[in-house]
Amino acid sequence: MKKFIAILCISLSINGLQAQEIPNSIIKSEVFKDEYKHSSIVLVEDDGNDGVFIVRSYAGGLFSSGAGYYFEHYDSNLKLIKEYEYEMKRSETEKQGSILGVIMNGDQVSLIDLVYNTNDKAYVCSALTSSITDFNFVKKELFRISVNDIKKVHWFGANQLDGDYGTNFMVNEDKTAFAITIDIKDKDTETHKVFLFDNKLNKKIDHDFKRDIKDKKFVYENIDVSKDGNNLYLLGKVFTEEKKKKKEGGKYQYELTRISKEGQATQVFDTDEHFSGSLKTIVFQDKLTCIGFYSDRKDYRFKGISYFELDPISLAIRKSKYNPFTEQFIIDKYGKSKDKELKNLSFRGVLITEQNEIVFNAEEYYMTSNYHMNPNGGGGYWTYIYHYDDIVSAKIANDGSIIWARNINKRQSTGGDDSYISYTSTIKGNDTYFFINTGEKVKKLSNDRIQFGQTSTKRSNLNVIRITPDGNFSFQEILDDKANEVPFMVSDGALSKNSVYFIGRKGKKKQLLKITL
């Protein structure tokens, strides 16, 4: 495993914060070894008998080639019942293959595979499906697209072009359907091939999304599935000639398109005098919301939360709001109230409470580089450091107003594996939880704040931070690093009901951890 050092400094502004007892239970699996060092959890599903079915991806390193998936069935105590290894092997005619995602239907598990077939000169998307009892995988073709229609070949499903990702795969919240979008070659018209399948692999939508604007003027944001599984919502950020003439605010508009079997319909909305660099669509039964950060200065500065609500059928705009960060949030970050906007925020995820309130999470992320001269002459080399700084979390009411917004100040950086830093977040009831690795001591700061310190991510204590419905904090150490044979990768947590699953790793040694709230 690549060696690296991560530096962490977390400070929280909390009224009367102290370590508290947060109800939880912990179960660990036995420590085990894989042939491959690098592995991560990609799917967790309850088996209906208090056990769990886990899918892990693996990849070889510098001296061990190979890639594939481990399928593992555990009982309620994380005792292994059954396991199966599926190694991805390609024929000579299959190139540039990639597993887009994994989906389950009862006891059937499917790997959604996309590969370039050199004989057919086409990209072919297939489902590799098996029962979890016998692991006899059967291939079913879902669709194919001629290579001549694809914008570029080498970036497929990986690199970013003109704001769009070549391929996008998403599974809806209920895990009953999945959507795939593919950027199609057409420099004069923004074009995406859009597919919707249910978890039984039935094709629900096969649609050509077109927008009469040059490709570089359209930025794909995201796609989501309606609650009934029959419609798709595609959000784009569009730079039109009309918006270019705006005197204030972002010189663009957002366009939300509803796609069905019958075709597509689009609603346009503006950020007025504000800037909103990116938005996320969230689908409810009776409404659509688009949520993100906004600024009064420019894109990718952040003053607060922007909120748009639309009708899910007509797409009529019901309301729009711009909520500045609360005074408590600013004190969290700076220790005092001040007029300053944030920067470098990266969206991390959305959580929905039982009351359909939105918990919107982000993280301050950026990269720095350093050039090192060779002491013996002959040039030098660059090193890159990836920073995972402040966590931002805000809870949004049904009317679009902010219930609370909190800032978790921290300083994390790594030049290698980022799995042990950052965080995983979940909710239970109306409480929001963050799982983080921290250092030995909790230090008190001014203005009733605290700070967690850490110097090495390989020696980490696992902590949970809880935000209650009124926005107050409490925290608790769950695992001391001295009691662990392996450190746990807190950025790769997988959620299932009221439990969070982590995998720990030290060399080839691994262990699964289940935390139930």
PLM regions and their residue ranges:
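Long, internal scaffold/assembly segments composed of regular secondary structure
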Residues: 222-356, 362
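Short, conserved, GDST-rich strand-edge loop motifs in beta-rich repeat architectures
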Residues: 53-65, 116-123, 176-188, 237-250, ...
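Conserved blade-ending motifs and adjacent loop-strand segments that build the rim/top face
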Residues: 90, 266-280, 317-342, 401-423, ...
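Loop/turn-rich, solvent-exposed surfaces of beta-rich toroidal or solenoidal domains
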Residues: 236-238, 292, 346-375, 382-384, ...
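Bacterial Sec-dependent N-terminal signal peptides
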Residues: 1-25
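Structural signature of eukaryotic scaffold interfaces centered on beta-propeller domains
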Residues: 35-49, 98-110, 155-175, 221-230, ...
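Blade-loop segments of beta-propeller domains
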Residues: 32-35, 77-120, 142-159, 207-230, ...
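Beta-propeller blade signature
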Residues: 68-78, 124-136, 191-202, 248-264, ...
